Amino acid sequence: MNRTCKEFLAVFSFALLLFIQAPTASAKGPTPKPLKVLVVAGGCCHDYATQTKLLKEGLEKRLHAEVTIEFNPAKGTDTTFKIYESDDWAKGYDCILHDECSAKVMDKEYVARILNAHKNGVPAVNLHCAMHSYRWGDFRQPVELGADNAGWYEMLGVQSTGHGPQSPIEVTYEKHGITQGLENWTTINEELYNNVRVYDGTTVLASGKQTMQPTKRQLKVDPDAKPREATAVVAWTNEYGPNKTRIFSTSLGHNNDTVADTKYLDFVARGLLWATGHLGKDGKPDAAFVK
């Protein structure tokens, strides 16, 4: 065998060895199971029938996730959800998305069951009227941590009591992995939820600025009343309970067109990735969980 032939065989053999050892798609490990996300929605004042569909479609389009909807079509502030009747209601889910509007649900055992899942480590994403749910006592005054009516606020990280008339909100992001790559934006007509308290340990992600026109009542008292500017924190994170469970919340999302907005859905999806531990501090998501 001449030298040229020997060299060819040596190169061919080495290349063949590399090919055999190279990992195939299956050798790299199986595709991880999709994130199991439970959306709990219903209650007063919003088109949850539409918004749950928008959230499911928007999240599943962006994430390697399966979104399950627990929807109660009731329209009252006393709306409850059958799933919460079980102590292990969150079993099997990687994240709970709270989209309830249940301000007058004051059953302490019921609320404790909800909170226990998060204390035990199940992450949460809270949207809009979830901030105005499960409240009792003198909730219009600042509530101290540890108070009888503080449980829900301790999970959220912010206490809010209301909002003014709808008008566009200028959203300005702070520097954080969740907001990495997102541009400031202005919503359509939306509700700017106030901040009675932003608790220690809460990390602000975004602030909102809104020009509020005088109401009819204000104009009746003062015909020369002028528009005023209101500002509030509109998105934040919190670490809740002994397990420091990750909680992401945004008070935006009253109207369907806001929930359908790409900018809103991108933000919520990134918040969910962060809550479940699949978004780095540098803002880079775990590639296995994005589409």
Language model features with spans:
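Loop/turn elements at helix/coil->beta-strand transitions in domains of secreted/extracellular proteins
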Residues: 33-36, 62-67, 91-96, 119-125, ...
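Solvent-exposed loop/turn segments at secondary-structure junctions
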Residues: 43-46, 73-76, 97, 101-105, ...
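An acidic, glycine-rich "communication" segment
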Residues: 52, 127-216, 284-291
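Short alpha-beta junction capping motif
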Residues: 36-41, 89-138
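N-terminal secretory signal peptides that target proteins for export/translocation
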Residues: 1-6
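Bacterial N-terminal signal peptides
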Residues: 9-21
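Aromatic-Pro/Gly-enriched surface loop or interdomain linker
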Residues: 27-93, 279-280, 285-291
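Extracellular ligand-binding/catalytic regions of CAZymes and related secreted enzymes
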Residues: 28-35, 50, 61, 212-291
